[in-house]
Amino acid sequence: MSYLRRCLPLAQQITLLNQPAAPVYSICRQRLFSTSSRSFTKTYLFTLDRPILQSTTSTLSGQHKIHTSAHHFKKRKIQEETQKHELDLLRYDIKALKDAPKPALYLGLAGLIPFVSAPLLMNVTGCYYPEVAFAQVAYGASILSFLGGVRWGFAIPENSPAKPDWMNLTNSTVPALLAWLALLFRDNITEAAVLVIMGLGIALHYDLALLPTYPSWFKALRAILTVVAVFSLVGSLINSSVYPHKSLVSQEP
């Protein structure tokens, strides 16, 4: 009966650790194996009323808990997928740029010429031209209106993943409104350029985070084009404070 004296205290400890749950029913079995000169005793402890995959105490001393339930694994998997999705948004799916259609890729890169040429011309000549800077801002305003129209047109088709709801259609009008406000600051190019930069950033945020339904290659292309356009506008703003101002149109006295 020595094996019963060994098992009963163990069962009592397990019962105390699992309170207020139902008591643990244990069955102790003894198997004797006889060899030439020794006998070996093996004691088995079976828990009948609790599943194996359950959040229990890892040791009898109660140091910490190990979560092994299926619900915990599922929740952890969802959290990992969410974090991975956020990281994908931060990377802007740059690797998918190689899948972009050639016309979209080439026309998008060619659309950067009006942005880049303005600060490049100022750096080469060593002068700041207000007319060139305003032409750059006006081009940026037209691009903002184009981006808003793209979102609107993407939500119109019946099979589109973006639905024509209030969120999609309302947010698509924000870039156009910022473009209109920028054009009102004709005599103050600095404020106009800041509005265009804000509009480009907001439009990119909508497309990548708030409304991430565009193809991966388009999001990658949008990110690259937006970054280059913003830096070009910032370059023109820096040139306005570095180089002397010179007008391209001769002013009559």
From Swiss-Prot:
Pfam families with a match to the protein in the record: DUF3429 (PF11911)
Coiled coil spans: none
Source organism phylogeny: Eukaryota, Metazoa, Chordata, Craniata, Vertebrata
Organism this protein belongs to: Xenopus tropicalis
Transmembrane among keywords: yes
Protein's recorded name: Transmembrane protein 69
Keyword Transmembrane helix: yes
Cell compartment(s), UniProt: Membrane
Membrane topology classification: Multi-pass membrane protein
GO cellular component assignments: membrane
Segments crossing the lipid bilayer: 104-124, 137-157, 165-185, 192-212, 223-243
Record keywords, A-Z: Membrane, Transmembrane, Transmembrane helix
